[in-house]
A protein has these predicted regions:
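ER/Golgi luminal nucleotide-sugar-dependent glycosyltransferases, focusing on the catalytic module
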Residues: 1-119
Length: 119
């Protein structure tokens, strides 16, 4: 819970919608005031299709219940490396596309960190 609270604090004042499978960890208190739990979460875990169902349930709940311009799926390890105000200014800027990329084959640190997701 502490890592999710840390992520929510970093993203404040924006709403952080959390899908948590309480059968995996029943005691999961979050203190950040901007956290909302997805109601009736599905069972998740490795080799369980519920992980995908949990993502879709979260997206459906967000679309039905929240008012937002941008939505990003995150895990607790996705802590921002720059202030939210800087990201907000960039996203609201005049650029037509908000996309950045890293040449994984040229950046060995990036290749070791996230390369398995690409190959």
């Amino acid at each position: 819970p502490a890592v999710v609270d840390q992520l929510a604090d970093a993203l404040a004042p924006h709403t952080v919608l959390v899908h948590h499978d309480f059968t995996q960890q029943a005691d999961f208190p979050l203190k950040a005031p901007n956290v909302r739990f997805v109601p009736n979460p599905v069972r998740t875990g490795w080799a369980v299709f519920g992980f995908v169902e949990g993502i879709f349930l979260t997206l459906r709940h967000a679309l039905a219940e929240l008012d937002f311009d941008y939505l990003q799926l995150l895990s607790p390890s996705c802590l921002p490396i720059k202030p939210m105000a800087q990201f907000e200014a960039h996203a609201m800027g005049s650029a037509l596309a908000h996309f950045d990329c890293i040449d994984l084959l040229a950046d060995h640190d990036a290749l070791m960190s996230v390369g398995y997701r690409a190959f």
